[in-house]
Amino acid sequence: MPSLFSSLLTTLVFHILIYYQINLVTVNIIMNCFQEKQFSRENLLKMPFRMVLTGGSGSGKTIYLLSLFSTLVKKYKHIFLFTPVYNPDYDGYIWPNHINFVSSQEALEYNLIRTKSNIEKCIAVAQNHKKSAHFLLIFDDVGDKLSKCNTLIEFLNFGRHLNTSIILLCQTYRHVPILGRANITHFCSFNISISDAENMLRSMPVKGKRKDILNMLNMIQTARSNNRLAIIIEDSVFCEGELRICTDTADKDVIEQKLNIDILVSQYSHMKKNLNTILESTKTKLCNSDQSSSSKNVSS
């Protein structure tokens, strides 16, 4: 009996070692194929993009989005937000007259149609002056209304022809319109389930095997689970021919609610003359090394 037990134990240990060696080889193959890289926010300025930020409530989606603003406003001077309820996090980041409250399907469709018309007029004016205008539409927690919005689907599929980029903040991939998923350029995961990621990537054009991407995504999420980490998968165009998964985190100033006044000043709005009143209504602290120069920009 002791010899039989010893033999069984030896066999069990042998199989365990083989199992871990196989998995270690698999991990090494994936790591050798795909690289984890710091996300280059400047790449978002190269061409129109369609980004999806997916994660549960409190996962850090909005804070990360706000961290992108200091980069995005270099190109996108017209930023519009669509949200069902007032969110104070956007105070000081988007002009109040560019925030659309859409509590119903009809309200979303109506406001998007109006916005599209205004974008077309603005582009025509800019072309007459031999200039270019770029637009960014943000949809925060709009839910199932996104998947049923025909105008949004048009923007996802053809928005690049209107110099328009799209950012969707969703708690689940199900809220991303099925007819627009093939045109998503950036998928940002905030600790979502692998099954949700798999469903999202099914339609998205990516470089490399989706199975390897999902394994790499799972490894990064598991290894860095204590951080509010954005794991970003780019499409086959934005990845610049590389097999890579990018990671990024929110900026410290944004987390600490230190507002950079230049973010608002860089955007176009008829409300610029009311900037001081708008800033006084927020409870954030200004983080601006040269407030006097910014004030001159406002008056000009």
From Swiss-Prot:
Family to which the UniProt record says this protein belongs: Belongs to the orthopoxvirus OPG160 protein family.
Purpose of the protein: Participates in viral DNA packaging and virion morphogenesis.
SUPFAM superfamilies in the record: P-loop containing nucleoside triphosphate hydrolases
Name recorded for this polypeptide: DNA packaging protein OPG160
Family annotation (InterPro entries): A32L (IPR006758), P-loop_NTPase (IPR027417)
Gene3D superfamilies with a match to the protein in the record: P-loop containing nucleotide triphosphate hydrolases
Self-association and partners: Interacts with protein OPG137.
Pfam families for the chain: Pox_A32 (PF04665)
Species for this entry: Monkeypox virus
Taxonomic superkingdom: Viruses
